[in-house]
Amino acid sequence: MTARISSPSLGAASYQERGTWTTAVSHRWQYSDRHFVGDEEQTVREAEGSQVINNVHVVDLSVSYAVSKRINATLSVPFQFATRSQAVRDNRIPNQFGNGTVIDRYQTSASGLSDIKVLGSVWLLDPENNKKQNVSLGLGVLFPTGQKDHKDVFKVFATNSAGVYTPRAETRNVDNSIQPGAGAWGIIFDLYGFMEVFENVNVFAAGTYIATPQEDAGVNDGPGTTGQIWSVGDSYLFRAGFGYTFLPKQGLTFTLGGRMEGSPSTDIIGDSGGRRRPGFAISIEPGLVFAKNGWSASFSTPVAIYRNRERNFAGNSGDAAFADFITLFSLGRSF
C-alpha cells in the first residue's frame, strides 16, 4: 500500500494565539511484507520467499501560522526514502506450490521531495468560550511536486545459450508504491474534533481525505512505453480515540484509538481507471504525547488488526503488501 499521509497530531488540540508560529518535523516508517487478496493473507508468498518488501521512510517538515486564535494555515514539505525488494522466478522449475521457483531477489529504490501540501483550517466554535470542546474544518491543496516516474534497474529472468540463468538488466519506472509523488494535483479535506469528558480525559476524532480528480499521471508499469498506466487514486485516514493526561504538570498524555487508512476503488471526483491497488488497514493505535512550554512531541505505533486488498474499479482482484505496524513520531516548537 502507498504511504503518503505522514504523522498527524494526537489527542486533544491546544489553541494557538494570533501570530504564533509552529514548526515541526515528523517521521513515518512503514515496512510492508504481508500479502493480502481481499482480507485473506497469502502465506504462500512468504513460504516460497516471493513476498514483496517495501521499506518506506517519510520525513515531513511543516510550519503553521495562527492567523487568529480561530484560523490556521499550514505548509507541509515531505521527503520520502523508499526501497522495494522483489523476487525473480524461474518458471521452468515449479516449486511445491505450483509456481516458478524463486532463484534470486533484487531491490529498487526511490527518494526525494514528495508532494507539498498547503492547508487552511478554522475552529467552528469560538475558542474563547469553548476551551473543552471544538471542531476544526480544513481545506487544502496537494501540489504534484514529487517525482512520479523515478526509474531504476530491474533484474529480469533470462538465460544464456546453455540455458543457465543470466539476469537481464532492464530500466523502468519503479513501482507506484515507492514513487515519491502521486503525479497529480489533489484537494485535501480535513476534520478534527475533541471534547473533554472528564478532568484530564478527552475524546477525539480526525479525518483526512485527499481527492485527486485526475485519472492517471501517464506513468506505465512496464519497460519503455509498454505495460499498464498507473491510476492516481484518492487516499484517506480516519482516527478516533481518547487521551488521558496522566501527568498534567509534566504535560504527558497517553492516547489510544482506532485508525483506518487506505485508498478507495472509486474516486469521489473524476474517473478511476488505470492500474491501482485499492485497500485499507484498520489498526489499534496507542501513543504518547508531550506538550509543555511551547514544545510538543508525539509517538504512536498503529498495529494492524485487519487488512483488505479490495477489488479495483473494474472489479478485478489482486494482491498488495501490508505492514504489521507503522511508527509515527513528531516534534514541534511554537513561538
Could you say what each language-model-derived stretch is?
Residues 2, 29-58, 177:
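Surface-exposed strand-loop-strand hairpins of Gram-negative outer-membrane beta-barrel proteins
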Residues 25-29, 75-79, 137-143, 205-209, ...:
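Transmembrane beta-barrel strands of outer-membrane/channel proteins
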Residues 11-20, 32-35, 70, 126-135, ...:
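Short loop/turn motifs that connect adjacent beta-strands in outer-membrane beta-barrel proteins
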Residues 82-231:
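Outer-membrane pore/translocation modules
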Residues 19, 55-59, 102, 110-116, ...:
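Residues that define the transmembrane beta-barrel architecture of outer-membrane proteins
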Residues 36-45, 210, 214-335:
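Outer membrane beta-barrel transmembrane domains
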Residues 61, 118-120, 137, 189-191, ...:
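Membrane-embedded beta-strands of outer-membrane beta-barrel proteins
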Residues 16, 27-29, 65, 77, ...:
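Residue-level signature of outer-membrane beta-barrel architecture
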